Amino acid sequence: MSSNIINAITGELITIDITLFISLNEFKKFLINRWQIDFNNLLLLLPFGNKINDRIFIDLIGKKNDQSTIYVFDRRLFSLVNNPDNELSSDYLTNIKNLLKGINHPTNNLNQLVKPVNSPYEEVEINEKFLNYHTITSLITTNLGWLSALEIDMHYFQIQISDTLDYIKNIIESLKICQNYLELYCYDVENLYNSNVKFLNQLANNEILKNWLNYYDNILTKLSDINGNKLSSYLNKNELVSISSKIEELDQRVNSNLKKFKIVIDKNIDLRNNINKEISSLSEKITPSSEKYKLEETMLEKFTELVKNLRNDSKVILEKDENEFDKNYMQNLAKSLEKDKKVTVTNLLTISKALYSQANDISEIKSKLQVDSIKLFGQISFIQIETLNIKKLLLNELNKDLEKYQGFELKLAHVQDIPLVYGLYSIENYRRESWVLQINYKHLDFNKSLKTIVEKEKSTRNKWVDNFGSTAVYFTEDMDTLRDFNYLNNIAKGNQSMIKKLEELFKNISNESHNKNLVFIETYIKEVEDLDLDKDVIELFKRYLAVAQGFVIEQPSTKNIISDKETGELINGYQSRIKKLELLLHSARYSNVESWPTGLLNYSNVKLFRNNVATVNSKLSLQSDYMGNISYGSDQLRIKELENVNKQYKTDFKALTDENKLLKDKVTKFNTDISDIQIERNAYKETLTKLNEELSRLTSIEGDFEKHKGEKEIELKIKIDGLVDSNKTLLNQISDLKIESKELESSNRDLLAQLNQKREEHKVLEDSLKQRENEGLRYKDEYEAKLKELTEKFEADRRALEDEIKAAKEQNMKESMEQQTEQSANQSIDQSIEQSTEQSTEQSTEQSMEQSMEQSMEQSVEQSMEHSMEHSMEQSEKQNMGQNDATIDNQSIETPTSEDMHSLDEQSPESQLLKSNTTELQPIKSQELAEDSKAIELKNIQEMLVSKLYEIFSSNVFILENIGLLLTFDEHDNFQIRRVKGLKKNLNQSVLEETGLLNEIEMPVKSDVFSEVKTLFSNYKETFDSRSYISLLSKINQLYDCKLYETAVIKRFEDIELLAKKLAKENKAKKNLFEKYRCERITLKNFEVGDLALFLPTRENCITEDVSVASWNSSFSSVDLSTPPPFGEPITNQSHSGTAKDKNKHNLEKRPWAAFTAFEETARYFLKDPENIPNNREWFVGKIMHLQRFVVEDHISNPYKLPKGAVWFQVTATVVSHQ
């Protein structure tokens, strides 16, 4: 029977026949070897959440036709307990990742997808000028290899997507199975809780606590016992009150605990429901549609067709001879290759990258699902722990309280049971007294009858002795003795002592006392009846009393003497009848509810005693049997002997029958054992056959795995070399990134400090501006009042002047041109005054009126000097209009010079009056001019601050995007900063320059918040109104008020630091692995201390010492030596003695050992102590411990007879391995 075995965290599924395993432990050992899960951490569940044990496993093996599914859980998945109400910390997520690293199977780590690389066509420029036969064939051959690799990758991506989809479905299904397991576990605890609640309700519904005190005061205090004592005296009321208070306390405590347990159980139920919802939502959200991750059939067909066509075209080109590659063919071939490069290769690469992206996406989905699964397992573990705590409390504390509760209620129930029990007790005492009296009478009668019988027997024996004793002496000598009467005498004596004891014990028991007890019982029943107790109790009293009154001792009947066989049959018949009667009695007792008495005690309506009076016939039958037996005589002796023999035969036959039956049972058992052994033997044979098949399959798999492992090791070594280089690059990038992060942090702090300073300055400027505005309004009011006063005064002076002019005109009508000039001046003054008055009324400004008056005076002077009235009037109007416009646009005031004032002084009195008015208006004009200049300065400062604030905001947004963070709006239009990948691709630079900000063209910002703020800033620059100003400040403040910017930047750098630590850790691991590989490799040149070298014995070639070093180096390596063996001892500068020469001669027989140097021809490496090398060794690998360099200069430094000038090393090495 094949079964599906699913790993709950990896989703891996295997199908295996579980009948191959003899026991559950053997099956667990298989899972341990398969998924490296400890024996104690294995948890096996069935689809309904049942936990697999030995019995269930045997049942599964027995169901040969049913296919079962077993889910394998690692208990470590439940070790990270997670309260669903609490938020997850970063440490918890780190623990999940570490747990996944420890739980995931090592083979899963090899499923690293390789991104498809570009075609060799895209790496070269296809041009017919640079193409030739060899270049084309090489390029096409390389591209064919790339095409084959691409096909393999596509097939692998498809398999990976399909397998990962199945893994995801299995993980989701495992989550549901684990939830079912939790439901089963909680169901038992909830049933236990419900049973406790039900039991408590039963105890509370008895209402004993409410009624006992009333019953005690109204019933027990009114009933008396036989001695006249009240029944209430048998109970301690204070103790009962204490018990009642304890029951109330227990009731409150138990109810309170049950409510608390109910809250926890309901909470666990809600949490379980939430887990169900999360699993369902996770299944809907994560479980991908298989169609989504499958390429369309047309795309697959297109891919296959493109590969096939490209391969066929390439093979056609490669099959051509070199002579066929003429100029025209090269031109067409270049066009064809260029077309393949732009169309075919591009399409193939696009399809492969799309499939690679899909495989990566679904792999990330599986990883996220594993993390979410461990979170849910932690929540399930939390709920299970809470439920277990509830179970312990229910079984320990609550059960003890309920037992106490029940015991206390039983004590209180005794209050209601005492009247009933005491009445029955009195009736039972009455019955016992009746029994004693009857026994006493019977005993006295028996003694009298025994005495008469003995005397009669003595008389009979004496008569027989008298008649036959003389002859009977031949048979016996004691026929006349009465030894058999000794036993009867002892019985008689015992009866006499027994009679005395009975008389002493029951001397107080008499008919009078017996009748007195009967009267008390009847009185007691009447009292109970008067107290209106339950009628069933009174009926029970009367029934029992009637039984006690009619009680007579039964005598055994000896009417019938039956055999053993008949006795057994009779007993069986009685037993069957008794069972039927018990069944009827049981049904009658529990079906007749009305006959049940009140209180906790349940009494039966069946009579406890029965008046079985022996009939006269039975007595007569007993007497007749006795007399018949006496009359049998000696004729019956033979019959008794034969019966005894027959009985012995029957006993022997029964024993033999039992023995035969026992032997038959043994034979049957042996036959059963033999058949079981045969079945087990066949099962073992079948199991052994399957195990052999499985072993052969595993052996083949192991061989393939070892082969694949060797290939993977080679690929892994190649990848490690690439990873070492990439790690170095990453470390350099990390160091640069750290420097950049420090610079960004310092610049950020400076900018924040500047921003705070500018905020304070701006706030001070706003306060001063408001104060200036208030002062300006006050000055404006004063100015208007002063202006009004001066205007009125000026009107009065003007009228007076007009009167004087009119008088002067009347007196000097005939004067010269000078008087006419004065008259024309007066007219121009009038017109100017009227115009200035109108302008001052409309604009309410003193500057326009005063300027008009001054210009009118200047024009009148010029006109008088030119003697042209009409020309001066036109010029005066034009200049007044121009000057007024200039005054309004430039917001400036021109004052008359000293020369002009002097010329006016020399003019008429009207000029002096104008001078005095102008002098009075000058202080007001200067003060207003100062206020306007300050307001303009404040406005310029405000504009500068707003521009500076906008620049700071822009810089901060740019910094955020430079480190991969994007400032956007959330669904509530609040600022949020998100991590966005690929955000830095279009940025011109990654760090802001210290001299200034980037221009808008140089700073592409993708933030929609920045776009909105930029729009507000542009509106403010155009309008300079307060509404735009407030909107701009409120938007910018949202970034800094809640420290959103600072938090995001700090967190980003913390993530970068964490990533740097992770990369450093991975680099360290890879470095250690690299060091391990480096230490294991054998060095072939440039030996150093610590290197591994291959040492070989040298060969003896005949080369003279005077040969040149170059020829010697080119002829052989360190192992191709022509020198004799070394002289044993290290090289020294001392002269050799005769003893050393003898030793050297002895060592000539041994061949020297040298290190193998395949790529070095300038030096030789000889082993210092070859004596330590075991004999008959062809080679050994040694670790170099010491090197000493020598150059051959003379005979002393040339023990190996090397050419002069040759370099050699003396090496000390330890043996690592040898052969």
Swiss-Prot record:
It is a peripheral membrane protein. It holds the Pfam family ATG17_like. Residues 831-863 have a biased composition (Low complexity). Residues 864-877 have a biased composition (Basic and acidic residues). Residues 811-882, 895-926 are annotated as: Disordered. Keywords: Autophagy, Coiled coil, Membrane, Protein transport, Transport, Vacuole. Residues 636-824, 1052-1081 form a coiled coil. One of its GO terms (biological process) is ribophagy. InterPro entries: ATG11, Atg11_C, ATG17-like_dom. GO terms for molecular function: molecular adaptor activity; protein kinase binding; SNARE binding. Residues 818-830, 909-925 have a biased composition (Polar residues). GO terms for cellular component: Atg1/ULK1 kinase complex; phagophore assembly site membrane; vacuolar membrane. PANTHER family: RB1-INDUCIBLE COILED-COIL, RB1-INDUCIBLE COILED-COIL PROTEIN 1. Involved in cytoplasm to vacuole transport (Cvt), pexophagy, mitophagy and nucleophagy. Recruits mitochondria for their selective degradation via autophagy (mitophagy) during starvation. Works as scaffold proteins that recruit ATG proteins to the pre-autophagosome (PAS), the site of vesicle/autophagosome formation. Required for the Cvt vesicles completion. Belongs to the ATG11 family. Homodimer. This is Autophagy-related protein 11. It comes from Vanderwaltozyma polyspora (strain ATCC 22028 / DSM 70294 / BCRC 21397 / CBS 2163 / NBRC 10782 / NRRL Y-8283 / UCD 57-17). The gene is ATG11.
